[in-house]
Amino acid sequence: MSQTARRLGPQDMFFLYSESSTTMMHVGALMPFTPPSGAPPDLLRQLVDESKASEVVEPWSLRLSHPELLYHPTQSWVVDDNFDLDYHVRRSALASPGDERELGIPVSRLHSHALDLRRPPWEVHFIEGLEGGRFAIYIKMHHSLIDGYTGQKMLARSLSTDPHDTTHPLFFNIPTPGRSPADTQDSVGGGLIAGAGNVLDGLGDVVRGLGGLVSGVGSVLGSVAGAGRSTFELTKALVNAQLRSDHEYRNLVGSVQAPHCILNTRISRNRRFATQQYPLDRLKAIGAQYDATINDVALAIIGGGLRRFLDELGELPNKSLIVVLPVNVRPKDDEGGGNAVATILATLGTDVADPVQRLAAVTASTRAAKAQLRSMDKDAILAYSAALMAPYGVQLASTLSGVKPPWPYTFNLCVSNVPGPEDVLYLRGSRMEASYPVSLVAHSQALNVTLQSYAGTLNFGFIGCRDTLPHLQRLAVYTGEALDQLAAADGAAGLGS
């Protein structure tokens, strides 16, 4: 292993600086598995033993050079000469037979604890005791060590499409993969996706994207000031979003339209995690019926779930909640088929009782936002995203001070949709049932929802502050009820099953 220190980059330092006792900057994934038929009863023990006997390679063997002083100007990654794999690889059990809700309880507790930054900042937990002899793997890692793209590549290389393959190394035996230009050119197909398109990317979008945009809005705007056309497009787009309310622009969501909400408060260190999984074909069929994308349908059922969840808490605002979405769009000046990563705001329709009308409201707002972005060149898109998010700095300051401003907020929560593997994957013959992203929350963002597609399903990972949003599992259940309501209202054969 190399003994050369590697300096942290600006984005990595941002996540490190954001670390606190209540805003932990680790992200993760929860993956339940079904063992193959005839698997030995000690299968999980064998996996754990194999893991602990494995060689660990960089970056998994790296720790901070100055863990006691995170703001050190020469903070670097160095090899941990006292690396203890027993500390990083752990085994625990549910009271058998455990269900998905019971699995969410230990994952919530594990995600509530900060990583020890005196050690390489990652852990993997093998959890047994799920009904039917199933088990789960929960992984968490600090976002300053592994970005989402790299983490996904390593996890994917630990799995196989062949159920009989037992040769794939575990993720911490895999060195950092390279990144080709083609990997960043994922087509959105009209949908909303997280920047790089991977299992863990987008988990830190609310911090990296918004924090970076807010802090750098001046420089970004300055970079296009000399380009007359870009400046004109930017000014026009901001006027359309912030000031115009006529028919053509009434569905555009501006940066001061989000209501004050319980989601936008200070948070504690305690977390609650919940999951849901739906067939993609079901969401696709509903979307086709109403000329909506899969992502629109997903947002609509999240809005329906939040409407009931907040109403039961007595915290449902009269106006609709506003969501921030990372998107990929094709700029008008790009003739090569490339995409630009941007940010839009959209309604969740939480003020609408009818599920079909709610979906229509969501679809209208996302369609208007993406159409506006497509009318701009790449420079204007980046500057527009920065300007749209700039008022979030005031929202965050308001949350931290406890003083509500007289004007609306910028947004209430972040939702990311991350395209994942299309094929069923296996770990030593055990079939991966789902891959749930476990994101992060922050002050003024007590809830984050990250979606990931996998083998014909859409997996929802809900992470929230336990003290702000008690009984978060109910929100996950209510999204399912909202989906059923949409299917029933549709009336098309097969959509209600």
From Swiss-Prot:
One GO CC term on file: plasma membrane
Keyword Transferase listed: yes
An individual GO BP term: response to nitric oxide
Keywords of the record: Acyltransferase, Glycerol metabolism, Lipid biosynthesis, Lipid metabolism, Transferase
Pathway: Glycerolipid metabolism; triacylglycerol biosynthesis
Keyword Iron in annotation: no
Catalysis performed (reactions): an acyl-CoA + a 1,2-diacyl-sn-glycerol = a triacyl-sn-glycerol + CoA; di-(9Z)-octadecenoylglycerol + (9Z)-octadecenoyl-CoA = 1,2,3-tri-(9Z-octadecenoyl)-glycerol + CoA; hexadecan-1-ol + hexadecanoyl-CoA = hexadecanyl hexadecanoate + CoA
GO molecular function: diacylglycerol O-acyltransferase activity; long-chain-alcohol O-fatty-acyltransferase activity; O-acyltransferase activity
Top-level taxon of origin: Bacteria
Active site: 143 (proton acceptor)
Parts of the chain that traverse the membrane: none
Induction description: Constitutively expressed at a low level, it is not further induced by hypoxia or nitric oxide exposure.
Name of the top EC class for this enzyme: transferase
Summary of the function given for this chain in its UniProt record: Upon expression in E.coli has a weak triacylglycerol synthase function, making triacylglycerol (TG) from diolein and long-chain fatty acyl-CoA. Also functions weakly as a wax synthase, as it incorporates palmityl alcohol into wax esters in the presence of palmitoyl-CoA.
Family: Belongs to the long-chain O-acyltransferase family.
Protein name: Putative diacyglycerol O-acyltransferase Rv3480c
Gene source species: Mycobacterium tuberculosis (strain ATCC 25618 / H37Rv)
